[in-house]
Amino acid sequence: MPNIKSAKKRVRVSEKRRLRNKAYKTFFKNRIKEVLKAIENKEPKEVVLELTRKAQAAIDKAVSKGVIHKNQGARRKARLFEKVNEYLRTLETTQE
């Protein structure tokens, strides 16, 4: 345990920030999982695109808040869009 007053405050502040960051991370990870589950359940194109838009916004917000690094945000979005685009291509080929 810290003895110095400023060190005690740093402990309080860092714990508060850790919990806030954890909430942002959980939020965007859940949005990504929703998209992947929609793809797995073969949801319609509109539903998948709407969920993808929400996931992208959640990732961007986490990046802007400094919860994750901008490169990690870009990588997560790229991998998500790769899966979404692959799913949309399979939808188009099955409709033809």
Curated annotation (Swiss-Prot):
Supply the gene name. rpsT
Q: Which GO terms describe its cellular component?
A: cytosol; small ribosomal subunit
In Swiss-Prot or TrEMBL terms, this protein is called: Small ribosomal subunit protein bS20
> Which organism is this protein's natural source?
Thermotoga maritima (strain ATCC 43589 / DSM 3109 / JCM 10099 / NBRC 100826 / MSB8)
Q: Which UniProt keywords apply?
A: Ribonucleoprotein, Ribosomal protein, RNA-binding, rRNA-binding
What this chain does, per the record?
Binds directly to 16S ribosomal RNA.
Recorded hits in HAMAP family, A to Z, give: Ribosomal_bS20
Family annotation (NCBIfam families)? S20
- Tree of life domain: Bacteria
Q: Which family does it belong to?
A: Belongs to the bacterial ribosomal protein bS20 family.
Q: Name one GO biological process term.
A: translation
**Which is one Pfam family of this protein?**
Ribosomal_S20p
Quote one Gene Ontology molecular function term. structural constituent of ribosome
In terms of InterPro entries, this protein maps to: Ribosomal_bS20, Ribosomal_bS20_sf
